[in-house]
Structures are given as structure tokens and as C-alpha cells.
Design a protein with these regions (language model features):
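N-proximal low-complexity "stem/linker" segments adjacent to membrane-targeting elements
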Residues: 1-26
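Short glycine/serine/threonine-enriched helix-capping/active-site loop
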Residues: 154, 181-184, 266-268
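A conserved acidic beta->alpha catalytic loop
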Residues: 38-49, 159
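Hydrophobic helical membrane-anchoring modules
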Residues: 1-2, 243, 250-318
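Short beta-strand-to-loop acidic/aromatic patch adjacent to the donor-nucleotide binding site
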Residues: 149-160
Length: 318
């Protein structure tokens, strides 16, 4: 727990066997739940995840084909319940999970114990089919929301996000100064010195396109996936409707703007080490441009064409 706030961290991972173990080990102690989502990796990622949790106590393992149960409840489940263990998806064989704390395994502890802490921190999750980075994050978001996390951060499984600054990422949301906080590597030359010119150029193009589509004109570095969001914001935006591929981050910003949410950039230094970006900008930029054009038109329609969105708060978000 951090400042009387429960904190969940989603760690999406695809073929990150070389890094995922260190990422899990580095999760700060104030984190209540860490949802490590293996998005159908073909290397040893899953084995590395399990190796991190098996030496301790038995922990719940959720395997999801197409995500967790789509009929999740609207709020936290009662103590002792197991999110995604019941419902149509489970009945159809799409979701397998430990059902209870006795017999079939250890169920998810949906409520903290007497000391205010959750029994287990790491929750291993595995997709049976690859859904993309956004799909992995959505699965983590859904579980965190069901378990009643107040703030949910995202820390990639490639080791490029410094766990020592997680408190800085979540601070604006915890303090109530923002609904969504994200890292920004483009504040000054010292922060983006590690970025290649090609990566900088691609980021600049995507930043401009995302500003136009979202209306967040002071926002920079939209491809930065080091983020934090409040549970209330997740409920308002609607996790199920989010894009699941690499354009996930941009789609989130468009939807946040349509709902009048406050977004804050948190300065951070770029860290790459030996990891190469999975984004191929030659194909990604045109594809994302089409997505952002649709997002721009949708935002205008949602903001000014519907009566159930607070347009005053949207304008105040500038």
C-alpha cells in the first residue's frame, strides 16, 4: 500500500525470458498486486515467471484465451471470491483458474488481510493466444479492477522502465492531481540522449498525430508505456473497448480526452540497454495514423454528439 492507496502493477510480457525475472524481482514493496501477463510467449517467459513465484507459497495461475471473463462485475468482488473463475467464459472453457483456497488450489484474495496487505503479490497470467501488448494490459486492468486496486500502473516486462521511479509515476494519481499519469522521455536532451534519431523522428510524428486526435496539446511522448491510472478512470473509459495492438496507448489518450480526464506527464530518462523496440515505424506509423483519424472523429462525435459526456470537463482539461 502507498499513501493509504492500494496499488496494482500490470507487467505485460511477450518473449521476455531474458528480462522478466529481474523485472518481477524489482517490483517495489509498496505494490499490493503485480499482474504478470504472458501474452502467449514462445520462449521461456512463462517458465521464468513461474520460477519467481514457486519458491514461495502456491499462487493463483490464470490462463486466458481472449482475455478474462468479459462479464466481470462492475466493482470489487467479495472477500474469498475468485475473479474470472465463474461466468460464461469459464463455462465455455475459455478461462481456467484456481477455484478456491482449498482443494483445487489457491484462489485470488480479493480483499487484504488484517494487516492491510494482500497475501500474495505476484499473480501469474497467461494468454493462450497472442492478443498484443494492449490485450495483455487489458487483462491486467480487468483483474486489478475486480480486486479493488485504487491505482493501476503498467511496467513493461522488457526491463526498460526503472522501478525506482514508480512512486513518481503514481504520485499524481494518488494525490488526486491527475486521472492518468505517463512517463515523458522528451523533456530535455539528457532524458532522450539514449534514443536513436529514427526512434526520435518516429516518436515526434506520433506525438503530433496523437495531439491532434486526443486534444491533449501539451502532452508529449505518447508511446511511453510507463503509466498509472485510477480505478474510477478505468471504469469511466471502459477497458473492454480499448484497442489491443501497439496503438493501445494512443487509443487510451483519445478516450481519456473524450471523458474529460486529466493527464500528467512525468519526466523520466530513456533506458534501452540491449532491448530493441518491437515497433516497425515504416508500417506502424501509417497503421496508427488510420487509427488516430478514426479516434479523432470518434472523439468529436462522443464529445459533441452525445448528451452523456461532460463536455465542460473536457474543455477544462486543456
Amino acid at each position: 500500500m502507498y499513501e493509504n492507496t492500494t496499488v496494482g502493477v500490470v507487467v505485460p510480457a511477450h518473449n521476455e525470458a531474458a528480462h522478466i525475472g529481474e523485472v518481477i524481482e524489482s517490483i517495489p514493496s509498496f505494490v499490493d498486486r503485480c499482474y504478470v501477463v504472458d501474452d502467449c510467449s514462445t520462449d521461456g517467459t512463462w517458465a521464468e515467471i513461474i520460477a519467481q513465484v514457486e519458491p514461495n507459497v502456491p499462487r493463483p495461475v490464470v490462463t486466458a484465451d481472449g482475455g478474462v471473463d468479459r462479464d466481470l462485475p462492475d466493482g470489487p468482488v467479495s472477500e474469498g471470491a475468485t475473479p474470472a473463475a465463474d461466468g460464461p467464459a469459464a463455462d465455455a472453457g475459455e478461462v481456467d483458474t484456481a477455484r478456491s483456497s482449498t482443494g483445487d488450489g489457491v484462489g485470488l484474495s480479493a480483499s487484504p488481510g488484517p494487516d492491510g496487505e494482500y497475501e500474495d503479490t505476484v499473480v501469474p497470467v497467461r494468454h493462450r493466444v497472442n492478443r498484443g501488448r494492449g490485450g495483455a494490459i487489458k487483462t491486467g486492468y480487468q483483474l486489478a479492477f475486480v480486486e479493488g486496486m485504487d491505482v493501476v500502473a503498467v511496467m513493461d516486462g522488457d526491463g526498460q522502465m526503472d522501478p525506482d521511479i514508480l512512486d513518481r509515476i503514481i504520485d499524481p494519481v494518488v494525490a488526486g492531481d491527475a486521472d492518468y499519469a505517463k512517463g515523458n522521455r522528451l523533456v530535455d536532451a539528457d532524458h532522450w540522449a539514449a534514443m536513436s534519431r529514427w526512434r526520435l523522428f518516429g516518436n515526434a510524428v506520433l506525438t503530433l498525430l496523437t495531439k491532434v486526435a486526443s486534444g491533449y496539446w501539451r502532452m508529449r511522448d505518447p508511446q511511453n508505456g510507463y503509466t498509472a491510472v485510477s480505478a474510477e478512470t478505468l471504469a469511466d473509459v471502459g477497458v473492454d473497448h480499448l484497442y489491443e495492438d501497439y496503438g493501445f496507448l494512443n487509443d487510451v489518450l483519445v478516450r481519456l480526452r473524450a471523458h474529460g480526464k486529466r493527464v500528467v506527464d512525468v519526466p523520466m530518462t530513456a533506458v534501452y540497454e540491449d532491448e530493441e523496440s518491437g515497433i516497425q515505424y515504416r508500417s506502424f506509423v501509417p497503421k496508427l495514423s488510420a487509427l488516430l483519424l478514426w479516434g479523432f472523429l470518434w472523439r468529436l462525435w462522443a464529445t459533441y454528439g452525445l448528451g452523456d459526456l461532460d463536455t465542460d470537463s473536457v474543455r477544462a482539461a486543456d
